Curated annotation (Swiss-Prot):
CoA binds at V71, A72, V73, G79, P112, F113, Y114. This is Acetyltransferase SACOL1063. Keywords: Acyltransferase, Transferase. PROSITE patterns: GNAT. One of its GO terms (molecular function) is acyltransferase activity, transferring groups other than amino-acyl groups. InterPro entries: Acyl_CoA_acyltransferase (IPR016181), GNAT_dom (IPR000182), GNPNAT1-like (IPR039143). The lineage of its organism: Bacteria, Bacillati, Bacillota, Bacilli, Bacillales. Coiled coil: none annotated. The keyword NADP does not apply. Belongs to the UPF0039 (ElaA) family.
Amino acid sequence: MFSKVNNQKMLEDCFYIRKKVFVEEQGVPEESEIDEYESESIHLIGYDNGQPVATARIRPINETTVKIERVAVMKSHRGQGMGRMLMQAVESLAKDEGFYVATMNAQCHAIPFYESLNFKMRGNIFLEEGIEHIEMTKKLTSLN
């Protein structure tokens, strides 16, 4: 269901999901949504019957740590375990790429979801594009 993005069409599908979720639903400015890290990130996309429904990207921070970013599931596919499957695929990809630690700036409304995946909060709540976030981290091991 989830694939590592390997062509422009797949990347455009990621951007489509992100625009729907972050720009249209959450009011993030469109010019902020696509950033300078796109080319150095590894993108993941999920399709359902050929339609793009979920995406995330990982960005190397150093030799051992990856930052999980732009996690988005289309509204039509929420509440069905899609986010959990997406995060499992993201973690698997990060481990396959040789990373041992994952970090992310999670939207505060999603803290319980990420805690259920064994992410731990670190630091204080901060605003990013007017939305409350908190840093969360997880050690990536074969026991996930």
